[in-house]
A protein has these predicted regions:
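Transmembrane beta-barrel domains of bacterial outer-membrane proteins
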Residues: 26-122, 130-139, 146, 242-244, ...
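Transmembrane beta-strands of outer-membrane beta-barrel pores
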Residues: 44-50, 78, 87-95, 131-137, ...
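Outer-membrane beta-barrel translocator/channel fold
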Residues: 50-52, 59, 92-98, 198-272, ...
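Solvent-exposed loop/turn segments connecting transmembrane beta-strands
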Residues: 59-63, 103-105, 137-143, 168-177, ...
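Hydrophobic, lipid-facing positions within transmembrane beta-strands of outer-membrane proteins
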Residues: 64-72, 107-113, 129-133, 147-151, ...
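Repeated loop/turn-to-beta-strand initiation elements of outer-membrane beta-barrel proteins
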Residues: 78-84, 121-127, 160-165, 190-193, ...
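Outer-membrane beta-barrel "beta-signal"
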Residues: 181-184, 190, 254-260, 286-302
């Protein structure tokens, strides 16, 4: 029987209706120099100057954004399937003007603890938690802990068509439990419709090492701001409040496979939507002016 290689099966759920796409691979050869298998990502995005507003009298203008991501997971095999053990770090830095009623930094440092298993030749399952600290700074970590988790699966209709189903749970979210669905469809030898959130896209494979794509990236996460954030910004309801940050990026890019273990990605596009939502305090700043962005990343499996 052909063995499914779960390390290539990527299924992450980060926000409402945001379910990442699975990939499928043949059985890989053993690595004689590094006995463990795994995956990694190093990514940097710059978003140009944009605007948000709460109402016509309250707005934040002309601020840029840096989004930095590091991700490293090892995938040792055990009898039930493949463990996923690792860590992630993401930092969103905003070039806000002095006195802005928004945090200038949002960051998450979390573990990745999960299991990939295969119920049958056609059904693949992932359970994964991301326990860690999600906040606007590391001043007080004791009550900034959160542990969102996902349960998802893929049904393989054929080598060219897969259905992705799952549910995300995050107690800090406005709607704690959210389901999602998506498909991956290889429409032609060089064309793939990867209609699975958070990165739905249409791909064109130029050759084995080069892929062009156009699509979107939908990001959402929940953070705790500082204990005195509300006092400093004139609204005590925002002290240690939960902030849901959302943004949508649309663009086009290129995946260039430099080696079997390294893929370089470059992407440019436009950010049409961004929102800072203190939903429990009923304070929301939404997009009032989009911005261009550019992304570069190195990623791979080993």
């Amino acid at each position: 029987m052909k063995i499914f290689e779960p390390r290539s099966f990527f299924l992450a759920f980060s926000a409402p209706f945001l379910f990442a796409t699975p990939a499928f691979a043949q059985e890989s050869n053993n690595n004689l120099f590094w006995p463990l298998s795994g995956e990694y990502v190093a990514e940097e995005t710059y978003v140009g100057s944009g605007d948000v507003e709460r109402n016509p009298r309250k707005s934040v203008r002309d601020f840029d954004e840096h989004d930095s991501i590091l991700h490293f997971v090892i995938t040792p095999r055990i009898k039930p399937g493949v463990l996923r053990l690792g860590a992630e770090w993401e930092r969103l830095s905003f070039g806000l003007p002095d006195g802005a009623p928004l945090p200038d930094t949002l960051q998450a440092v979390n573990l990745v603890i999960g299991l990939d298993t295969q119920l049958s030749d056609s059904i693949l399952i992932r359970v994964e938690a991301q326990p860690g600290v999600y906040d606007a700074g590391f001043d007080d970590l004791s009550d900034d802990f959160n542990a969102p988790f996902v349960v998802g699966g893929t049904y393989i209709f054929s080598p060219n068509l897969q259905l992705v189903l799952g549910v995300s749970v995050d107690i800090e979210r406005k709607y704690p439990v959210i389901p999602a669905v998506g498909i991956r469809w290889k429409m032609a030898p060089q064309w793939v419709l990867n209609a699975v959130l958070p990165t739905p896209r249409l791909e064109f494979e130029v050759n084995n090492g080069l892929t062009l794509y156009a699509g979107a990236n939908l990001k959402q996460a929940n953070y705790r701001v500082d204990d005195n954030f509300g006092d400093n910004t004139g609204n005590a309801r925002l002290n240690h409040a939960v902030l849901t940050y959302t943004e949508v990026r649309t663009g086009a890019g290129i995946d260039w496979k430099l080696s079997p273990f390294v893929t370089l990605t470059g992407e440019v596009g436009y950010q049409p939507y961004r929102e800072f939502d203190f939903y429990r305090a009923d304070v929301t700043y939404h997009q009032d002016g989009g911005a261009p962005y550019g992304t570069i990343s190195l990623r791979g499996t080993f």
